[in-house]
């Protein structure tokens, strides 16, 4: 680590590799060159050999790792003949500018003893060599990196004149040295310099006699222990240049504001040459009081993670009657968010510490070079959005406006906002990066609490001072920091900020309304700049030969020019607001006023700046500055959109974006209002500060229900809307070539109306027929014709003949919360749900630079798949699934535009060529299906992942040909998760049959979200093909074993059975577990004892014993006294328990096997003319191999005369004909079978939410059935629907069911293999049949 230690004598430490530098005439360049030549484990020693011993100017910087940050401090120093001074609460003196004379003020021995006794807990004892001195740790002066750059510039200018300057050095340490007071002017002093100082003292006493009196009184007698800890330093400097007397009276301007490139480049350059980045360097420096520059700010920057950043802050005193009073360092990090103001409070308590010269210091890790640090989080009280100046209050609070970051507006956003603090450090000890510029020759006035005023005898703030900084910081449209206060002529007088001071005045700042207006104006400038950059990029693409939709970009140059004019207009507005509202007065009786620089950031003449460093940058520094622009991204753009969906709240975000419609335009229109077409910065788009995403989803569902209720109540699908019922709000901008888009209001609901530009009434009527399947549209024909003749206000008129009922179409049956709803029609115009406040995914990615993180990506992908699954279940293809037809609002709600009517029209396809499936390009009509949407879906996923337009370097014609005939696809980035890469490759497969369905895709994303198939918890029962074969063999072996044993046995003696325990009770019997001849058996003791004498019962039981089947519970025999039946005992439990009690989840193959086995068992029973009549999941049992066994059959037929209807069948599974008391046949079991299949697939109880009786009644008399999930395969959906048909003759037999299941099996296997391959197969994700575009940026 680098350590700068004070060498208190002239003895050199003759260690290995020592570098001895004579202190006479030392300059900054000499020092830096010497530091550059040092290496690891070297010691750099600078000896003070100047014989003038009355000037004490040594540096002590401790740089060792510790949770405590140590800063260099300045001892109180006073110029002879003056009682005025600059008060710095510290003890160590630092190098001051050329020709500056210093003297350490003498304190009496008794006063010194009092100070030693009254040290508060904020004092830290340092040991330097053989002497000790005190450091007030809570009032350290903080570094200022801008000033260091200015020092280097000034030093270069002064090198040619250094022979005219006299260097005064001293080799004593800073402390309470009684010999210093009388030896300030000695024989080695420059007489010109002495004359200048005396001249300045004369002016100073003349103008500030009040302060002389106050300080003399305070010096003669101090009344509090706190005031005794205050050190006083009075420093006067002159800028002695070659012009001598003429320039001696001129005021020295403050360091100029550096542009970001110069600031960071030169900081890094100094850092590399002065500190070497070597952790083991031990550089010991005792610096003379030689002049470094004319800025009073010294900076030590450290690029190592193990080094502390220490410095002190000296302030130049010009040769004038103005005094600068500094106590508290400024906290102005360079890269704080825009319009954010920290309110820093003094630390209420500090801890007493005694630290020697080996004290460790805070380490700064994981920071890029020259990255400023933030104040400690303990010092941050509140964060406010504001635009104003630094303010001061009597309570000691320090309000600072932090400057904006220096990266360009288009820098990639990083949404990870973190407070960069020093762990364990005092909030005062941080990097000071403020820059105070002065346009005129006046000085800044900085107030502090510890100045010894006449009425100030007590310190009420424990060393925490207020700073009245006159700098006004704002970020220009070019994203550079401008800190340029303009000081009017006159002397700035200072006063105490102590609340007891009689002349204390509160300063006045900008009012809240002006601040808010300034903030909004700045945001609008940033938006315009981002929009301009996007348009320039599009123009460049067109110039490179990319001609997609080139017609829509014809006026790009004009639009860019308009944006530039608008930016200038807004900057002028900022100027006027600043000039009219930003003046304020200093505290006390100051006559000086400070105002913002009236010049616009773009109109400022760079030649007026006193800094010319940027013009002298080398190529390497320019390159480095460009790298820093990327690395040091704007902190106001850092939000955690990437970490979580529920993060990155932006309360100030304001969406004024597209008011799109559900129907979309030619490109599914991202419609924008003509008044405002831009949105906020992309990372400020999403806003979910107070509520979670789930709550926004709930609101979306409520809005969806409200809109569907509006449609139902007004019968909008069956009758048109009268034009007089709607209100035209505004015409929306759209890329649609076929329609005019209007924002309308209907019954207090905002909607979108698409007015066709084509006045062909027949064509418009045909389109309306397709959407609404209207049987009576003649009434609106005339209105459609008149609409064309009467322009906008008559296009919705309809005649009185359009009141007849219209039959709903399949399009009116498509309703989903994530789909833009079809609302109705008015004349020839179609009305859709409005997407106001939403922006298309295309615009968010390509216009606003939004980066999609994985959590948001999965949400968008799943919502789209859910909508598309519903459309395909209705046999409707969307036809235009692109990033332009997908919309998002600030709460991450996804909407997909309404499907196109010409979705599969090969002659007039609705979709863009780069999203078009290859079979459409090849005009293969027999291959056109809903899978064209799956193909387009893959490109939407790719676009969201890469933030690039598909095939951006090809025109439309080239893309269509290369995709269709060369199988060209964009290259998927390797940073994309493997499972997503595989999914995309499957979706854009060349053959439609190889593409998955949206139901498969939806289940995949359910799995990625931690859910597999069903939301209910439980274990997954899976089955593969090998297990299926093995279990079939086991089932047959056990069945054959039992059959052989029972051959010839019909009756069992009850005393041959050992009853173990009761295991349950059913409708007809109590069930017990028993042991019979070594076999576990289920003993069902019938409740109706009269049955034992019924020969029919005995004959029925006998027939059951002979009818063995692997999927039917095996009957072992019966006992007449008492009447009971013996069956095999199945320890797997019932299917009802598995699905609804244990909540076991089933994979597709297990589902298929259960359904298939159940069909086999029921087919066997029906083949021997046996009806079950109580087929429910409770009567379906599983053995240890999870094989299906049907139980409790056959008895209902015998007991039909004795049992009530409710006892025959459970009401939930009861067929309508049984409920109605009609004649029935074996089809009652088919009805129940359909409900059991529904249970197996969904894991839900049939008619969930209704009791048994109500469900049976609604099923019989209202034809009510449970809702089949949209992700259910179409073939299985059709089978279930057939099985629970109201008409028994429409239900299939179990033989027909088995035939359908055999054809369905391949789809189940394909579904299983698709999911398993995506999740488990580690093979390469690339498709060998595809050619990947290597030119596409991945």
Swiss-Prot record:
Entry coiled-coil feature ranges: none
Biological-process GO terms, alphabetical: hyperosmotic response; positive regulation of gene expression; positive regulation of protein import into nucleus; positive regulation of receptor signaling pathway via STAT; regulation of cell differentiation; regulation of sorocarp development; signal transduction; sorocarp development
Keyword annotations from UniProtKB, A to Z: ATP-binding, Kinase, Nucleotide-binding, Phosphoprotein, Repeat, Transferase, Tyrosine-protein kinase
Post-translational modification: C-terminal tyrosine kinase domain is capable of autophosphorylation, in vitro.
Superkingdom of origin: Eukaryota
Pfam families, per the entry: PK_Tyr_Ser-Thr (PF07714)
Domain Protein kinase, residue spans: 693-1014, 1057-1309
Acidic residues composition bias: residue spans: 212-231
InterPro entries: Kinase-like_dom_sf, Prot_kinase_dom, Protein_kinase_ATP_BS, Ser-Thr/Tyr_kinase_cat_dom, Ser/Thr_Kinases-Pseudokinases, Tyr_kinase_AS
Top EC class for this record: transferase
GO molecular function, one term: protein serine/threonine/tyrosine kinase activity
Catalysed reactions, as listed in the record: L-seryl-[protein] + ATP = O-phospho-L-seryl-[protein] + ADP + H(+); L-threonyl-[protein] + ATP = O-phospho-L-threonyl-[protein] + ADP + H(+); L-tyrosyl-[protein] + ATP = O-phospho-L-tyrosyl-[protein] + ADP + H(+)
Binding, ATP: 699-707, 727, 1063-1071, 1084
Gly residues composition-biased segments: 657-667
Region (Disordered): 1-21, 203-254, 282-316, 449-515, 595-618, 648-673, 770-802
Gene3D superfamilies: Phosphorylase Kinase, domain 1, Transferase(Phosphotransferase) domain 1
Claim: Transmembrane helix is one of the keywords in the record: no
Biased composition (Basic residues): 449-463
GO cellular component term, pick one: cell cortex
Active-site feature positions: 1174 (proton acceptor)
Enzyme Commission numbers on file: 2.7.12.1
Stored SUPFAM superfamilies: Protein kinase-like (PK-like)
Free-text function comment from the UniProt entry: Involved in the development. Negatively regulates tyrosine phosphorylation and activation state of dstC/STATc, probably by activating a dstC/STATc phosphatase.
Domain notes: The truncated N-terminal protein kinase domain lacks most of its classical characteristics and in vitro, has no activity.
UniProt-recorded name of the protein: Dual specificity protein kinase pyk3
Provenance organism: Dictyostelium discoideum (Social amoeba)
